[in-house]
């Protein structure tokens, strides 16, 4: 019997082919991350503002025109331009001469350190008025103490009045003591007057005896 050769397997992807297929995806992702590095929005804004010769500063509309002339897509990156302006003003690289926020006019700050120095000074001046406000309640607290001292003084004045009333209360007692001996002196006199009255019944007895004698004589 003749041996038959095994049929060839259908086209199966080799393992190396799968790895090769995955690599292009990673390369595509790397291409997205590796965009051509150009100047940032803040750098473009600073260049455009420094190039302007206007004394009052470069307006937002003029800034957009300058960026568009340099090949920057202003319509798509409108929000980035506004954020870049705000960050540059907060850092002190740009000074806003007109308007508020991202709208208005901007110019380069010749002394960028001045903005950072002025901010802490304002905080220090705002903190100074708090010290006198703290002293006022202390002064107000001292005033009631003086009022309490004034209230204490009438108590001292009341003490002599109380002493005078005590002396006045004691004086009637002395007067009562002085009046008592007189009553005691009068009482013996009354006792003496009563004693002779007790002696009178004794004098009546002889009269009764005399009456008996006269009756005996008549008999």
From Swiss-Prot:
GO terms for biological process: chromosome condensation; negative regulation of DNA recombination; nucleosome assembly. GO terms for molecular function: double-stranded DNA binding; nucleosomal DNA binding; structural constituent of chromatin. Residues 1-40, 94-219 are annotated as: Disordered. Signal peptide: none annotated. CDD domains: H15. Pfam families: Linker_histone (PF00538). It is found in: Nucleus; Chromosome. Residues 119-134, 142-159, 167-185, 192-219 have a biased composition (Basic residues). The modification N-acetylserine is found at residue 2. Belongs to the histone H1/H5 family. This is Histone H1.01.
């Amino acid at each position: 019997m003749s041996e038959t050769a095994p049929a060839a397997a259908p086209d199966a992807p080799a393992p190396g082919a799968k790895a090769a297929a995955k690599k292009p995806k990673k390369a595509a992702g790397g291409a997205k991350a590796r965009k051509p590095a150009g100047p940032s929005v803040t750098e473009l804004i600073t260049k455009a503002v420094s190039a302007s010769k206007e004394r009052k500063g470069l307006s937002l509309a003029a800034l957009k025109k300058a960026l568009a002339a340099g090949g920057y897509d202003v319509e798509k990156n409108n929000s980035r331009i506004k954020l870049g302006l705000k960050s540059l003003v907060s850092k002190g690289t740009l000074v806003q001469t007109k308007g508020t926020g991202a709208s208005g006019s901007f110019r380069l700050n010749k002394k960028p350190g001045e903005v950072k120095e002025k901010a802490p000074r304002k905080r220090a001046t705002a903190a100074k008025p708090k010290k006198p406000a703290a002293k006022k309640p202390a002064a107000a607290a001292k005033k009631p103490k003086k009022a309490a001292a004034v209230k204490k003084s009438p108590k001292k004045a009341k003490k002599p009045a109380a002493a005078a009333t005590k002396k006045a209360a004691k004086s009637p007692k002395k007067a009562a003591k002085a009046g008592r001996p007189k009553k005691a002196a009068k009482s013996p006199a009354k006792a003496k007057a009563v004693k002779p009255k007790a002696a009178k019944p004794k004098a009546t007895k002889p009269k009764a005896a005399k009456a008996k004698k006269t009756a005996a004589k008549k008999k």
